[in-house]
Amino acid sequence: MPPHAARPGPAQNRRGRAMAVITPRRERSSLLSRALRFTAAAATALVTAVSLAAPAHAANPYERGPNPTDALLEARSGPFSVSEERASRFGADGFGGGTIYYPRENNTYGAVAISPGYTGTQASVAWLGERIASHGFVVITIDTNTTLDQPDSRARQLNAALDYMINDASSAVRSRIDSSRLAVMGHSMGGGGTLRLASQRPDLKAAIPLTPWHLNKNWSSVRVPTLIIGADLDTIAPVLTHARPFYNSLPTSISKAYLELDGATHFAPNIPNKIIGKYSVAWLKRFVDNDTRYTQFLCPGPRDGLFGEVEEYRSTCPF
């Protein structure tokens, strides 16, 4: 540039006034396109952030209760207040009557029927009824037609008890039951009955035999998620001839677990037991409510071996 030449300035009209710079149409189009792409990317990032912040289990319509903890599951009662209703022996069809425990909160819940063992009454499993109901289930603990009823008879009576809750109980009970989500449990011969009914009703969501007894050792026809709880000092239904072979015979294609209590006898399920309560609730929550928040307690499961309350635990994890 010559030493005294004027520097280029804004475009001027004939009168020396500055003129507006006109952006070419192609450049305006490019700027608009970049702005739109930036806005879309920002919106996508916002939606992704919101999605990641939302709980993964929020879509489960069966989820009930707060996030579970060891302390919550090991406590004597869960987060729900419970009411109870008597099922009269004279009004019950196909079983000996019982007691129904249900959450007071007006909602729908899975339903569970529990049978006592040989010579036992519902009183021997009453603690389980109230404990499980307090975690968000409708539960019936039954008396059998006679205390000497055998396992297959107890299977039929468990089935009748489920039907009673769905069809014949009070409206307070019936209105709270989701009849598509049913489970069974039982102690001793009631545990054998639980296995028998599970082999006959693949629509059940869960089965939990407790120190089970049955002459049949092959349960390969069961298609229901099953947790078997045995006791290492059981001399009535020794785990070597009952709980363990029962578990081993269940197909590996189903969700199943075996928990053996350490230092416990055949009658461990008849009094409040922290381990039985905790893992029974976790199993029912996982498979009746499809609540994966409880998987953490089942997979990998409790620590077993020396100095623990569990002698052995094995399963078909992951669930």
Curated annotation (Swiss-Prot):
Biotechnology: Shows promising applications in the laundry industry as a cleansing agent, as it is thermostable and tolerant to surfactants and organic solvents. Has potential for application in biological recycling of plastic waste products.
One Pfam family linked to the record: PETase
Disulfide bonds: 299-317
InterPro entries: AB_hydrolase_fold, FrsA_esterase, PET_hydrolase/cutinase-like
Enzyme class: hydrolase
Reaction equations catalysed: an acetyl ester + H2O = an aliphatic alcohol + acetate + H(+); a butanoate ester + H2O = an aliphatic alcohol + butanoate + H(+); pentanoate ester + H2O = pentanoate + an aliphatic alcohol + H(+); an octanoate ester + H2O = an aliphatic alcohol + octanoate + H(+)
Extent of the signal sequence: 1-58
SUPFAM superfamilies documented for this protein: alpha/beta-Hydrolases
Residues annotated as catalytic: 188 (nucleophile), 234 (charge relay system), 266 (charge relay system)
Domain of life (superkingdom): Bacteria
A single MF term (Gene Ontology): cutinase activity
E.C. number: 3.1.1.74, 3.1.1.101
TM annotation in the entry: none
Keywords: Disulfide bond, Hydrolase, Periplasm, Secreted, Serine esterase, Signal
Location of this chain's protein in the cell: Secreted; Periplasm
Gene Ontology, cellular component aspect: extracellular region; periplasmic space
Description of activity control: Activated by magnesium ions. Activated by calcium ions.
Identification of the protein by name: Cutinase cut1
Top-level taxonomy: Bacteria, Bacillati, Actinomycetota, Actinomycetes, Streptosporangiales
